[in-house]
Amino acid sequence: MKKFLSVIMLSATLISFAQDKAIKYNQVPKTGQQFINKHFGAKQVGSVMLDDDYFSKEYKVYLANGTKVEFDGDGAWKEVDGKRNAIPTGFIPAKISNYVKRSFPNTTITKIERDRKEIEVKLNNEIKIKFEIPSQYSEIFR
């Protein structure tokens, strides 16, 4: 019974430390700040959250227009979510941007997510497209 209670207490402690906490924008890694300044210049930062667990850090920057930008612990972007509004495309690999423009004219990218193996974009018509890294078309799904 003691072991069981110890495991429960340890789990509760770990969970409590893994929650988002509000931080200042200048605490985001410089790479992340440069990304925000370059691609979202005129939009103001609303709030910044740090998700810090024992294994990794993740920064979430919420802009005044509702856009959310997530960074890993080094400040590399992981996700940009325009919440159904178009996002800037200057940071998106050219092969992906060109494929979307050519294959889905009159649409805009509203969300992009990246991990080590793939990039997924979501368009304003709700179509999602996955690309294997490096930038090879993978699949389209609705």
Question: What is each model feature region?
Answer:
Residues 1-23, 36:
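Bacterial Sec-dependent N-terminal signal peptides
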Residues 19-142:
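Interaction-mediating elements
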